[in-house]
């Protein structure tokens, strides 16, 4: 229990630091992606990133059955709950901060989910173009 509390404290402090400087793909303040389920590398609801975020979880995407199946086939099962990480499992319609590289893989395979541009971190542009994101923007 102590370890979990300490981990939450560290993540909270890292998230507060990341949030202070986070911008979206339009150079505007990053907006909330989703609070239910709580998403983001820091589980703060935002697609914030930092040096500890190896996967670069910066693209706010709306889950689809097609994408959930695609990512599971790549070894990342997002649909099955994992109580150890307090992860509820995702279903179509949920929003989640995806790894930029995984979203690009899905894009290349015609399986990319729609994205909330205002909630997608500017760091995503290191991996995909703004045109690719706009093509999959939630209208």
What are these model-predicted stretches?
Residues 17-139:
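A charge-rich, low-complexity, intrinsically flexible signal that marks solvent-exposed coils, linkers
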Residues 2-15:
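Short, positively charged and aromatic/hydrophobic N-terminal segments
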């Amino acid at each position: 229990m102590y370890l979990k509390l300490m981990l939450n404290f560290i993540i909270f402090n890292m998230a507060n630091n990341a949030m202070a400087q986070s911008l979206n793909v339009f150079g505007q303040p990053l907006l909330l992606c989703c609070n239910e389920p709580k998403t983001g590398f820091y589980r703060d609801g935002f697609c914030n990133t930092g040096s500890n975020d190896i996967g670069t979880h910066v693209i706010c995407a709306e889950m689809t059955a097609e994408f959930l199946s695609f990512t599971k086939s790549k070894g990342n099962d997002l649909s099955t709950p994992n109580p150890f990480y307090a992860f509820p499992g995702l279903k179509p319609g949920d929003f989640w901060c995806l790894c930029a590289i995984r979203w690009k893989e899905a894009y290349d395979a015609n399986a990319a989910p729609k994205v909330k541009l205002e909630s997608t971190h500017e760091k995503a542009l290191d991996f995909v173009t703004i045109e690719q994101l706009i093509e999959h923007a939630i209208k």
